[in-house]
């Protein structure tokens, strides 16, 4: 188990460390943003494939089928493609355009890096993501500008941003609630 943190580079580094340990498979798991309007915070997505500007990576079908069958007996899950972005997909407009361009149902920032390493090393790949923010959610400025690569706020700047723009506080609490639902579903 390796906690990569947020973003392509962090995930790439973690996946390389795991392959050095001679693993035979990689799992990308964590939270994602919905770009399909039918998804809500807490929903589980099993990726059929990962899409990014560099390519299209399929997950391991038999592994995906077994996990999907098991999880379906516990709760409803969604199967579809996940687009992996190097930048945060911050607004509902960005999410809409990404959905239209890719037909994916969710967006994350790590799975393509893990998929690249799995593909390069002929490793099985499974991608499990839970939804933290729905397609209509816009990520507040304090979160975008004042959190580290583990999602933790840089307190002083975060608080100053909230004081400068207090309207975002409600959105921060809504995002936190969705994130908590996503983590609980994992």
Model regions and ranges:
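Glycine-rich phosphate- or other oxyanion-binding loops that anchor nucleotides, phosphorylated ligands
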Residues: 1-186
């Amino acid at each position: 188990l390796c906690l990569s943190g947020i973003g392509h580079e962090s995930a790439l580094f973690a996946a390389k460390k795991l392959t050095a340990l001679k693993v035979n498979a990689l799992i990308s798991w964590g939270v994602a943003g919905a770009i399909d309007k039918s998804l809500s915070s807490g929903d589980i997505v099993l990726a059929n494939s990962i899409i990014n500007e560099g390519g299209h990576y399929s997950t391991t079908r038999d592994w995906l089928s077994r996990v999907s069958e098991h999880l379906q007996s516990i709760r409803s899950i969604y199967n579809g493609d996940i687009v992996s972005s190097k930048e945060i997909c911050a607004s509902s407009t960005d999410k809409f355009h990404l959905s239209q361009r890719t037909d994916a149902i969710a967006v994350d920032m790590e799975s393509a890096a893990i998929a690249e390493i799995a593909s390069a090393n002929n490793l099985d790949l499974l991608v499990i993501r839970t939804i933290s923010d729905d397609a209509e959610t816009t990520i507040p400025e304090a979160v975008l500008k004042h959190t580290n690569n583990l999602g933790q706020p840089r307190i002083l700047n975060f608080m100053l941003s909230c004081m400068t723009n207090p309207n975002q506080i409600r959105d921060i609490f809504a995002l936190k609630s969705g994130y908590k639902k996503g983590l609980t579903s994992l």
